[in-house]
Amino acid sequence: MIINVDLHIHSHFSGATSTSMTIETLAREAPRKGIDVVATGDCLHSEWQREIKQCERIDEGTFLLGETRFILTTEVEDKNRVHHLLLFPSFSSVDDFKERITKFSSNIETDGRPNVSLNGEQIAEFAKDVDALIGPAHAFTPWTAMYAYHDSLSSCYGDLTRYISFLELGLSADSNYGDRISELHRLTFLTNSDAHSPYPVRLAREFNRMSVKEATYREIKNAILRKNGNSVTLNVGLPPQEGKYNESACISCFRHYTLDEAVKRRWRCICGGRIKKGVRDRVNELADLPVPKHPEYRPPYLHIIPLAEIIAKALGQNSTFTKKVTKRWTELVDAFGSEVNILLDADIEEISKVTVPAVTEAIKAFREGKVIIHPGGGGRYGTIELPNEEERDTVRDKQKTLSDFLKT
């Protein structure tokens, strides 16, 4: 069977996270996005565990509420500020891991994403001890990621590098970025939302399509490990330019700089603010390949833009959270079942019967790869622009649908 999976979210017990990030809300919103399995996130937090345990237990590591299945995950920050994503096979595994790290964390009961005074190798060793999967979260992000502080996997994970099976690309990178670094070729790439709110523009803005026998933790683990015929068949995510840290830019005024310009200015903007190195420039520093070399098993990467963002641009709204945008998004999802279906597969003529012409044309422009993206940087997301009608034939190649990828 084919499932869509988002393996990195946060609960309302994490800092800077919406109070609406409850199990009930996630279970309701995931199907409307087109997602079958959602990570719990924050599973070390005792209060969040109590909410998770309200779900029906499918097996030791898989839980069900409504139509949505959940698996146990968390993110932790090590002593070097590197974030790691962990997937657990059971609550007993979670409890064993928590017991090992509690004495190294001062906020394990107060923050869903705890700080742990251990390095990556030590955390990976504890993960291995409890049979959990571990890998770098949003690996290229310049603040709290592996490649922000390390130049290689082994620098971060030491002798446990061989145990690392996946890498989360993050919103400012895609497979073309990752596969310019040959040490990553053996790893499965994951694309996840890292959602801090359940809003359509955040939840499942990136996800993984997997071929599995059933929608359970063990089958998802086998897909990540590429075992028993299971695999990740498609990575779906934002164009890297939409990420907050794609290009090097000032974190105060968001002025963009080339790498040479930033170096010459000693990473200080003309406004006096700090210039933060972008993912694109960091990948260019790390890359040992001039162009991406994808291993045979690497799935295609499908770029996607959240439907609410497309609707907002079509209606001339400055925010994705206005009543007008919400109304049009809800109308479409009610008619076609999920956001993924609307963006990629629903018949455009049928869409035109449900929504206004401006929204139909915007969805069509996205499908045809004709949306212009102005890159993000310095902590500000990239923005999209809908081309004028006469410009649309010259912008980009046509965007494939999920069905197109399944045929290849």
Give the positions of each predicted feature.
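An N-terminally biased module of ancient metal coordination in phosphate/nucleic-acid-related enzymes
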Residues: 1-79, 370-372, 381-384, 391-397, ...
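Extended substrate/RNA-proximal surfaces in nucleic-acid metabolism proteins
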Residues: 2, 49-165, 398
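Divalent metal-coordination and catalytic microenvironments
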Residues: 8, 42, 86, 134, ...
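Histidine-centered divalent metal-coordination motifs
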Residues: 8-12, 138, 196
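Histidine/acidic-residue-rich catalytic or RNA/ligand-binding cores of hydrolases
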Residues: 15-17, 49-50, 144-150, 199-211
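C-terminal functional module detector
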Residues: 28, 46, 57-60, 70-72, ...
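Short acidic/histidine-rich active-site segments
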Residues: 186-202
